C-alpha cells in the first residue's frame, strides 16, 4: 500500500512516503528510525547523506507523521537569524492544543551563510527541548557547526550493504509498478522499470522523476528502454566502412552520428579497440580520437569534424 496525495500532480510529490515503514531504506537505518518512533518523542536529530535523493526530507517528515507530531517545515535557506528569533521561537514556545509533540524540520541547513543562525540554534535547542524537537537535514555534515552537532543525534544514512541494495531495488521496482497501476501507465516491458531503478540507485527521487518524464505517452516500452540504458546498438556500420575504405558510405554515416558526438566517439573507440591490430594502431586510435575530441567544442560544423576523424582513422588503422 502506497501513500497517494491526490492534491499533487508531480509524481515525486504525489507518491512521497508518509511513514518510515513506507520509506525504502537500508535495514540498519530502518531499524534506527523505527526505534526512535517507538519512544513517541524525538530527540534533536541531524539526518545527513552525501547522496541526493536518498530520502532525508522524506524520512524527517515520516518521523513526524509516525509520532503524530505538530510539524513546522522550514527551508534552510530561509532560516536566518531573524526567522529563528521570530517564527521558530513562537512555534517552539507554544503548546499544542491537542497535546501533540512538536517538531521543527529545517531542510538543508548546511548551506552557506547560515553559521549565525546555527550558533543561535544551540541555545534555542536547550531552551525549548522539553516542548519541541529539531530535525535538521544536510548533504554535507561539515556545513553544520560542531556545537550544533554535539547537541543532536547525528544519523548518516544511505550507505546500503550489497544485500540492502538488492532488497531496496526490489522494493523500488514494486513501488514503481504500483505507481504505474494507479496512473494507468502501461508497462509493456518490465525491463524499463528495472533499468530506471538500477540506473539511478540510490537516488529514488530521480527515479520517480524519470518515470514521470518517460511515461508521458502512457506506456513504458522497448523504445523507452533504449533511452534509459543508452543502448543505441553498435557503430559496426562505421567500422565496416572504414575497413573497406568506403569513403562514400562514411560520408553518408557522418550526419547520423554527429548528432550525439559524445556517445559516438566513446562507442567508436571502444569497438575499434577490440578490432584493430595491437601496437601502433591502438596508439593512432587514441591520438586521432583524442585530438578530435579536444577540438569538438570549437568545430563550427560537427558533421565535417566527424568526417575528418573517420578519414584519419581509415588511413591510419590496421585491422586484425
UniProtKB/Swiss-Prot annotation:
Gene Ontology MF annotations: ATP binding; ATP hydrolysis activity; DNA binding; DNA clamp loader activity
Q: Quote the CDD domains the UniProt record gives.
A: AAA
Which InterPro entries would you find in this protein's record? AAA+_ATPase, ATPase_AAA_core, DNA_Rep/Repair_Clamp_Loader, Gp44_C, Gp44_lid, P-loop_NTPase, T4_Clamp_Loader_L
Q: Which cysteines are joined by disulfide bonds?
A: none
UniProt cross-references to Pfam families, sorted A to Z = AAA, Gp44_C, Gp44_lid
- Keyword tags: ATP-binding, DNA replication, DNA-binding, Hydrolase, Nucleotide-binding, Viral DNA replication
Q: Which SUPFAM superfamilies match?
A: P-loop containing nucleoside triphosphate hydrolases
Which PANTHER family does this one have? REPLICATION FACTOR C / DNA POLYMERASE III GAMMA-TAU SUBUNIT, REPLICATION FACTOR C SUBUNIT 4
Please name the HAMAP family in this protein's record. T4_Clamp_Loader_L
Stated name of the protein = Sliding-clamp-loader large subunit
Amino acid at each position: 500500500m502506497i501513500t497517494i496525495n491526490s492534491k499533487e500532480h508531480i509524481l515525486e510529490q504525489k507518491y512521497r512516503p508518509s511513514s518510515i515503514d513506507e520509506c525504502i531504506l537500508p535495514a540498519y537505518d530502518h531499524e534506527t528510525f523505527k526505534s526512535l518512533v517507538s519512544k513517541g518523542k524525538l530527540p534533536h536529530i541531524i539526518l545527513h547523506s552525501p547522496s541526493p535523493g536518498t530520502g532525508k526530507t522524506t524520512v524527517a517528515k515520516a518521523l513526524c507523521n509516525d509520532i503524530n507530531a505538530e510539524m513546522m517545515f522550514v527551508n534552510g535557506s530561509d532560516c536566518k537569524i531573524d526567522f529563528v528569533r521570530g517564527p521558530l521561537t513562537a512555534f517552539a514556545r507554544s503548546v499544542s492544543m491537542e497535546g501533540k509533540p512538536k517538531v521543527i524540520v529545517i531542510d538543508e541547513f548546511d548551506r552557506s551563510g547560515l553559521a549565525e543562525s546555527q550558533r543561535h540554534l544551540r541555545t534555542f535547542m536547550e531552551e525549548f527541548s522539553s516542548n519541541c524537537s529539531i530535525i535538521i537535514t544536510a548533504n554535507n555534515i561539515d556545513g553544520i557547526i560542531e556545537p550544533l552537532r554535539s547537541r543532536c543525534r547525528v544519523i548518516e544514512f544511505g550507505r546500503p550493504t550489497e544485500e540492502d541494495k538488492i532488497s531496496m531495488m526490489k522494493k523500488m521496482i514494486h513501488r514503481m509498478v504500483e505507481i504505474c497501476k494507479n496512473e494507468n501507465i502501461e508497462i509493456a516491458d518490465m525491463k524499463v522499470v528495472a533499468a530506471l531503478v538500477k540506473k539511478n540507485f540510490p537516488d529514488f527521487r530521480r527515479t520517480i522523476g524519470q518515470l514521470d518524464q518517460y511515461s508521458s505517452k502512457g506506456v513504458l516500452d522497448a523504445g523507452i528502454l533504449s533511452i534509459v540504458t543508452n543502448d543505441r546498438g553498435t557503430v559496426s556500420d562505421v567500422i565496416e566502412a572504414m575497413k573497406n575504405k568506403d569513403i562514400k558510405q562514411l560520408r553518408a554515416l557522418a550526419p547520423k552520428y554527429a548528432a550525439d558526438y559524445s556517445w559516438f566517439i566513446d562507442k567508436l573507440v571502444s569497438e575499434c579497440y577490440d578490432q584493430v591490430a595491437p601496437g601502433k594502431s591502438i596508439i593512432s586510435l587514441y591520438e586521432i580520437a583524442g585530438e578530435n575530441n579536444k577540438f569538438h567544442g570549437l568545430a563550427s560544423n560537427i558533421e565535417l569534424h566527424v568526417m575528418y576523424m573517420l578519414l584519419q582513422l581509415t588511413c591510419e588503422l590496421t585491422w586484425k
